[in-house]
UniProtKB/Swiss-Prot annotation:
L-glutamine binds at residues 52-54, 115, 143-144. One of its GO terms (molecular function) is glutaminase activity. This is Pyridoxal 5'-phosphate synthase subunit PdxT. NCBIfam families: PLP_synth_Pdx2 (TIGR03800). Coiled coil: none annotated. GO terms for biological process: glutamine catabolic process; pyridoxal phosphate biosynthetic process; pyridoxine metabolic process. In the presence of PdxS, forms a dodecamer of heterodimers. Only shows activity in the heterodimer. Pathway: Cofactor biosynthesis; pyridoxal 5'-phosphate biosynthesis. Belongs to the glutaminase PdxT/SNO family. PANTHER family: PYRIDOXAL 5'-PHOSPHATE SYNTHASE SUBUNIT SNO, PYRIDOXAL 5'-PHOSPHATE SYNTHASE SUBUNIT SNO1-RELATED. Its EC number is 4.3.3.6, 3.5.1.2.
Protein backbone atom coordinates (compact mmCIF):
# COMPACT_ATOMS: atom_id res chain seq x y z
CA UNK A 1 0.00 0.00 0.00
CA UNK A 2 1.18 3.49 -0.87
CA UNK A 3 0.02 6.84 0.56
CA UNK A 4 1.09 9.96 -1.31
CA UNK A 5 1.72 13.49 -0.06
CA UNK A 6 1.68 16.19 -2.74
CA UNK A 7 5.22 17.57 -2.50
CA UNK A 8 5.35 20.45 -4.95
CA UNK A 9 4.85 23.07 -2.22
CA UNK A 10 3.83 23.35 1.44
CA UNK A 11 4.22 21.46 4.76
CA UNK A 12 5.26 18.15 3.21
CA UNK A 13 7.75 16.54 5.63
CA UNK A 14 5.46 17.09 8.62
CA UNK A 15 2.63 15.16 6.94
CA UNK A 16 5.00 12.40 5.82
CA UNK A 17 6.28 12.05 9.39
CA UNK A 18 2.78 12.10 10.93
CA UNK A 19 1.55 9.42 8.51
CA UNK A 20 4.57 7.20 9.18
CA UNK A 21 4.07 7.53 12.94
CA UNK A 22 0.34 6.81 12.62
CA UNK A 23 1.06 3.70 10.53
CA UNK A 24 3.70 2.54 13.04
CA UNK A 25 1.20 2.96 15.91
CA UNK A 26 -1.12 0.57 14.09
CA UNK A 27 1.59 -1.85 13.06
CA UNK A 28 0.57 -1.37 9.42
CA UNK A 29 3.20 -1.56 6.72
CA UNK A 30 2.76 1.02 3.99
CA UNK A 31 4.95 3.31 1.95
CA UNK A 32 4.52 7.07 2.37
CA UNK A 33 5.77 8.80 -0.78
CA UNK A 34 6.22 12.39 -1.90
CA UNK A 35 4.39 13.22 -5.13
CA UNK A 36 6.37 15.70 -7.22
CA UNK A 37 5.26 14.76 -10.73
CA UNK A 38 2.53 13.09 -12.73
CA UNK A 39 2.15 9.31 -12.62
CA UNK A 40 2.38 8.59 -8.89
CA UNK A 41 -1.16 9.53 -7.79
CA UNK A 42 -2.80 6.56 -9.60
CA UNK A 43 -0.59 4.18 -7.56
CA UNK A 44 -1.73 5.63 -4.21
CA UNK A 45 -4.40 4.33 -1.83
CA UNK A 46 -4.61 7.73 -0.12
CA UNK A 47 -3.57 11.28 -1.02
CA UNK A 48 -2.71 14.27 1.18
CA UNK A 49 -2.70 17.86 -0.13
CA UNK A 50 -0.71 19.91 2.42
CA UNK A 51 -0.84 23.57 3.32
CA UNK A 52 1.20 26.20 1.51
CA UNK A 53 0.31 29.07 -0.80
CA UNK A 54 -2.93 28.12 -2.55
CA UNK A 55 -2.41 30.19 -5.73
CA UNK A 56 1.00 28.59 -6.33
CA UNK A 57 -0.28 25.15 -5.39
CA UNK A 58 -3.23 25.33 -7.81
CA UNK A 59 -0.98 26.55 -10.62
CA UNK A 60 1.59 23.79 -10.10
CA UNK A 61 -1.06 21.06 -9.81
CA UNK A 62 -2.53 22.17 -13.14
CA UNK A 63 0.85 22.59 -14.86
CA UNK A 64 2.17 19.20 -13.74
CA UNK A 65 -1.06 17.36 -14.55
CA UNK A 66 -1.32 16.16 -10.94
CA UNK A 67 -4.62 17.97 -10.34
CA UNK A 68 -6.47 15.89 -12.92
CA UNK A 69 -5.02 12.71 -11.43
CA UNK A 70 -6.27 13.72 -7.96
CA UNK A 71 -9.77 14.38 -9.37
CA UNK A 72 -9.81 10.98 -11.05
CA UNK A 73 -8.55 9.24 -7.89
CA UNK A 74 -11.16 10.96 -5.70
CA UNK A 75 -13.90 9.96 -8.17
CA UNK A 76 -12.74 6.33 -7.81
CA UNK A 77 -13.15 6.59 -4.03
CA UNK A 78 -9.51 7.07 -3.05
CA UNK A 79 -9.41 8.99 0.28
CA UNK A 80 -8.06 12.55 -0.01
CA UNK A 81 -7.05 14.82 2.90
CA UNK A 82 -6.54 18.55 2.30
CA UNK A 83 -5.17 20.84 5.02
CA UNK A 84 -5.15 24.67 4.97
CA UNK A 85 -4.38 25.51 1.32
CA UNK A 86 -5.44 21.93 0.53
CA UNK A 87 -8.95 22.82 1.75
CA UNK A 88 -9.04 25.64 -0.82
CA UNK A 89 -7.73 23.43 -3.64
CA UNK A 90 -10.44 20.80 -3.00
CA UNK A 91 -13.31 23.32 -3.08
CA UNK A 92 -15.89 23.77 -5.80
CA UNK A 93 -16.00 27.54 -5.39
CA UNK A 94 -13.90 30.32 -3.87
CA UNK A 95 -14.55 33.83 -2.63
CA UNK A 96 -13.77 37.00 -4.58
CA UNK A 97 -10.09 36.79 -3.65
CA UNK A 98 -9.83 33.28 -5.11
CA UNK A 99 -11.60 34.42 -8.29
CA UNK A 100 -9.30 37.45 -8.56
CA UNK A 101 -6.17 35.30 -8.46
CA UNK A 102 -7.61 32.92 -11.06
CA UNK A 103 -6.98 29.79 -9.00
CA UNK A 104 -8.04 26.57 -10.73
CA UNK A 105 -9.81 24.73 -7.92
CA UNK A 106 -10.24 20.97 -8.25
CA UNK A 107 -13.95 21.13 -7.38
CA UNK A 108 -13.89 17.79 -5.57
CA UNK A 109 -15.81 19.06 -2.52
CA UNK A 110 -19.15 20.83 -2.69
CA UNK A 111 -17.88 23.79 -0.67
CA UNK A 112 -17.40 27.54 -1.04
CA UNK A 113 -14.29 28.83 0.70
CA UNK A 114 -12.95 32.09 2.12
CA UNK A 115 -9.23 32.17 1.28
CA UNK A 116 -8.06 34.18 4.31
CA UNK A 117 -10.93 33.66 6.76
CA UNK A 118 -8.67 34.02 9.79
CA UNK A 119 -6.31 36.73 8.57
CA UNK A 120 -2.77 36.77 7.25
CA UNK A 121 0.49 35.14 8.40
CA UNK A 122 0.85 37.40 11.44
CA UNK A 123 -2.59 36.25 12.64
CA UNK A 124 -1.49 32.65 13.21
CA UNK A 125 -2.90 31.09 16.38
CA UNK A 126 -3.87 27.86 18.14
CA UNK A 127 -7.33 26.92 19.39
CA UNK A 128 -8.90 23.99 21.20
CA UNK A 129 -11.44 22.51 18.80
CA UNK A 130 -14.42 20.23 19.19
CA UNK A 131 -14.29 17.90 16.20
CA UNK A 132 -17.25 15.56 15.64
CA UNK A 133 -15.06 12.56 14.75
CA UNK A 134 -12.91 12.86 17.91
CA UNK A 135 -13.89 12.09 21.51
CA UNK A 136 -11.97 15.00 23.06
CA UNK A 137 -10.75 18.46 21.94
CA UNK A 138 -8.02 18.77 19.31
CA UNK A 139 -5.45 21.60 19.27
CA UNK A 140 -5.80 23.28 15.89
CA UNK A 141 -2.84 25.25 14.52
CA UNK A 142 -4.08 28.01 12.20
CA UNK A 143 -1.64 29.76 9.85
CA UNK A 144 -3.17 32.31 7.48
CA UNK A 145 -6.10 29.94 7.57
CA UNK A 146 -8.99 29.65 5.15
CA UNK A 147 -12.52 28.62 6.09
CA UNK A 148 -15.60 27.11 4.49
CA UNK A 149 -18.38 29.66 4.01
CA UNK A 150 -21.03 27.19 2.86
CA UNK A 151 -21.37 23.61 1.74
CA UNK A 152 -23.76 21.38 -0.16
CA UNK A 153 -26.10 18.77 1.35
CA UNK A 154 -23.61 15.93 0.80
CA UNK A 155 -20.97 17.58 3.00
CA UNK A 156 -20.73 16.74 6.71
CA UNK A 157 -19.53 19.59 8.93
CA UNK A 158 -17.00 18.28 11.47
CA UNK A 159 -15.98 21.47 13.29
CA UNK A 160 -16.61 25.21 13.47
CA UNK A 161 -14.74 28.17 14.91
CA UNK A 162 -16.28 31.65 15.20
CA UNK A 163 -19.21 30.49 13.03
CA UNK A 164 -16.81 29.47 10.24
CA UNK A 165 -16.66 25.83 9.13
CA UNK A 166 -13.08 24.65 9.65
CA UNK A 167 -13.39 20.90 9.07
CA UNK A 168 -15.67 18.92 6.78
CA UNK A 169 -15.90 15.66 4.89
CA UNK A 170 -17.71 14.50 1.80
CA UNK A 171 -17.51 10.74 1.42
CA UNK A 172 -13.84 9.89 0.91
CA UNK A 173 -12.67 13.54 1.01
CA UNK A 174 -11.63 15.32 4.22
CA UNK A 175 -10.77 19.04 4.40
CA UNK A 176 -9.30 20.98 7.33
CA UNK A 177 -8.54 24.70 7.72
CA UNK A 178 -5.88 23.92 10.33
CA UNK A 179 -2.62 21.94 10.43
CA UNK A 180 -2.91 18.59 12.30
CA UNK A 181 0.61 17.71 11.15
CA UNK A 182 2.07 20.51 13.31
CA UNK A 183 0.97 18.82 16.55
CA UNK A 184 1.91 15.51 18.19
CA UNK A 185 -1.75 14.45 18.14
CA UNK A 186 -2.16 11.80 15.45
CA UNK A 187 -5.92 11.27 15.78
CA UNK A 188 -6.87 13.05 12.56
CA UNK A 189 -4.19 11.21 10.59
CA UNK A 190 -5.48 7.99 12.17
CA UNK A 191 -9.02 8.88 11.07
CA UNK A 192 -7.72 9.44 7.53
CA UNK A 193 -5.89 6.09 7.68
CA UNK A 194 -9.18 4.42 8.68
CA UNK A 195 -10.61 5.65 5.39
CA UNK A 196 -7.56 4.41 3.46
CA UNK A 197 -7.55 0.98 5.11
CA UNK A 198 -11.28 0.45 4.65
CA UNK A 199 -11.15 1.05 0.88
Amino acid sequence: MKIGVIAIQGAVSEHVDALRRALAERGVEAEVVEIKHKGIVPECSGIVIPGGESTTLCRLLAREGIGEEIKEAAARGVPVLGTCAGLIVLAKEGDRQVEKTGQELLGIMDTRVNRNAFGRQRDSFEAELDVVILDSPFTGVFIRAPGIISCGPGVRVLSRLEDMIIAAEQGNVLALAFHPELTDDLRIHQYFLNKVLSC
